[in-house]
A protein has these predicted regions:
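Short acidic alpha-helix that forms the nucleotide-activated donor recognition element
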Residues: 41-45, 153-163, 184
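Conserved catalytic-core segment of nucleotide-activated headgroup transferases in glycan assembly
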Residues: 72-144, 148-160, 210
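Acceptor-binding helix/loop patch of EC 2.4 sugar-transfer enzymes
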Residues: 6-38, 92
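Short alpha-helical segment that forms part of, or immediately flanks, the ligand-binding pocket
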Residues: 156, 177-184, 198-199
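Donor nucleotide-sugar binding/catalytic pocket of nucleotide-sugar-dependent glycosyltransferases
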Residues: 7, 30-37, 41-84
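Conserved acidic donor-binding segment of nucleotide-sugar-dependent glycosyltransferases
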Residues: 204-214, 220-227
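A charged, aromatic-enriched C-terminal amphipathic alpha-helix characteristic of glycosyltransferases
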Residues: 225-248
């Protein structure tokens, strides 16, 4: 029909599907791999313009389908008026925050943190989101300093009250929405290489980039009591705040 189309790819979905198959080795995941790659191939082929979230995804599309996206447009988030956000009144102990949907990289990351980090730190870990309903996590024996809060009415109060946000994510594609969201609240963030994909900053100032249990524990032990990280908030305002990107 000659219609022009713009495809904004938030992941290299074929790679995500393959990672899921490696995670659960199910026949369903294997079938999904083939169908997703088939559909993605034609989406990339026939799009008038292709947009990706970061350089890694551009490389992935070029490697799989022979086409490099014409534009990189990162995930953004609206500016938060922090003066209007109330802290958690029912929590009086310092805590780390993990936020995640019921998605296998989140489940894998949360369980890894519970097993390898939580028993060796003094801070509580509060896990928020649909990931808490996943049976693998919901029925797991957890240390006393881990709280599965599940769905919450006001996520902003958790962000404001947390000492830091942790993102122990080891698989994925695209960018991590919850990391950008945490930045919009000016939080210190301790995450993996995967968690920080597409984010340009001094990771030692935003929190820490960690990929081993030892690195996570060391970074957590080095956290200050300051609940607001001005450097994180400045990076967000300069690079990932929605209106800033729209006005470029």
């Amino acid at each position: 029909l000659g219609a022009k189309t713009i495809v904004f790819e938030h992941n290299v979905d074929a790679l995500m599907a393959y990672q899921e198959f490696l995670y659960d080795h199910s026949f369903t995941s294997l079938i999904k791999c083939y169908f997703i790659k088939f559909n993605e191939k034609f989406s990339v082929k026939y799009a008038t313009a292709l947009i990706a979230l970061n350089k890694r995804d551009c490389d992935g599309f070029e490697r799989l389908y022979g086409r490099r996206p014409e534009m990189i447009l990162p995930i953004t988030s609206p500016k938060v008026d922090l003066s209007l956000v109330l802290g958690l009144s029912v929590v009086n102990k310092p805590f780390l925050l993990f936020v995640g949907a019921n998605f296998y990289p989140n489940i894998e990351g949360a369980i890894w943190f519970i097993e390898h980090i939580a028993p060796y730190i003094s801070l509580d870990l509060r896990i928020v989101g649909a990931c808490c309903e996943n049976p693998t996590l919901a029925y797991k024996t957890i240390p006393s300093n881990v709280k599965l809060d599940g769905y919450v009415n006001d996520l902003s109060s958790y962000y404001k009250s947390a000492v830091a946000v942790v993102a122990p994510i080891f698989k994925g594609s695209g960018m991590k929405t919850k990391v950008i969201e945490a930045m919009s609240y000016g939080k210190s963030i301790i995450g993996t290489d995967e968690a920080f994909q597409g984010i340009e900053c001094d990771f030692s100032r935003i929190g820490a980039k960690c990929n081993t249990a030892e690195e996570f524990i060391k970074a957590i032990e080095s956290l200050s009591d300051n609940l607001f990280n001005p450097y994180t908030y400045q990076v967000f305002s300069d690079k990932y705040e929605t209106s800033t990107v729209e006005n470029r």
